[in-house]
Curated annotation (Swiss-Prot):
InterPro entries, A to Z: Class_I_gatase-like, Peptidase_C26, PuuD-like
Protein name: Protein NtpR
GO BP of this protein: polyamine catabolic process
Cellular component GO terms held in the UniProt record: cytosol
Gene: ntpR
Domain Glutamine amidotransferase type-1 stretches: 12-239
Keywords: Glutamine amidotransferase
Keyword Plastid: no
Molecular function as annotated in GO: gamma-glutamyl-gamma-aminobutyrate hydrolase activity
Active-site residues annotated for this sequence: C113 (nucleophile), H217, E219
Length: 239
């Protein structure tokens, strides 16, 4: 049987002409394609009540947390910074419940960009709400409108980590974020850093807890970059 990979979905709330003014539940196509290419069965989990998280996690084998909006600073007890962008507290709370339930059921988690940030927050860490508050900021972390296949900066992968087994010790990545990990959650360790010292990868300190995250977007380049696809292959088939 194909492993069932739940992808935590996003919601388009503001009306657009593309969808005739309808709200839409969605996930980026790259996640769907990458999971299918890895011989997994992708299932999009729509934003729902946190009370339903256990029922959703019961139905899947593994969980992917995707990118999207900023994370509400309510979750780490800070007032909103003036440069905070769009948030969706309902999504934050639902995905936080998914994380807690996946950990409870010992089901693996792969967290990408916002997903990695939320994972850190749920486990007790905090964020830079905008990189202007990071004193060592010197790297272009938001490369828009440059296409994702054109990597914008390097990351250093630390030895004795999961990512070190999957990636070169120095790796070029795309970058689309203005928030970043600040205080690392006590149960996590950093596995990759940008040249200006921001955390670009995480995993659990407990080897029995199967989770890892990256700050870049491998789902945007998996079709042209076999190394990025390898992250999905590993997660779906081995992790």
């Amino acid at each position: 049987m194909l492993p069932i990979i739940g992808i935590a979905g996003n919601q388009l709330i503001r009306a657009t002409d593309t969808f005739q003014g309808n709200q839409v539940t969605y996930t980026p196509q790259g996640f769907v394609n990458a999971v299918q290419q890895a011989d997994g069965l992708p299932i999009v989990l729509p934003i729902s009540s946190p009370k339903t998280a256990s029922a959703y996690i019961d139905q899947i084998d593994k969980l992917i947390l995707a990118g999207g909006q900023d994370i509400s600073p309510q979750l780490y007890h800070e007032p909103p910074h003036p440069k905070l962008l769009e948030t969706n507290l309902q999504r934050d709370l639902f995905e936080a419940a998914l994380i807690s339930e996946a950990l409870k059921q010992n089901k693996p988690i792969f967290a990408v960009c916002r997903g990695m940030q939320l994972l850190n927050v749920v486990l007790g860490g905090s964020l830079y709400q905008d990189l202007t508050t990071y004193p060592k900021w010197s790297v272009k972390h938001e490369q828009h409108p440059t296409a994702p296949q054109f990597a914008t900066h390097e990351v250093e992968i630390l030895p004795d980590t999961l990512l070190y087994q999957l990636l070169p010790d120095t790796y070029l990545v795309n970058s689309y974020h203005h928030q970043a990990l600040k205080e690392l959650a006590p149960s996590l360790k950093a596995t990759a850093f940008s040249p200006d010292g921001l955390v670009e990868g995480i995993e659990s300190l407990d080897k029995d807890v199967r989770l890892f995250g990256v700050q870049w977007h491998p789902e945007l380049t998996h079709s042209s970059n076999s190394t990025d696809q390898g992250l999905f292959d590993f997660f779906v088939q081995e992790f």
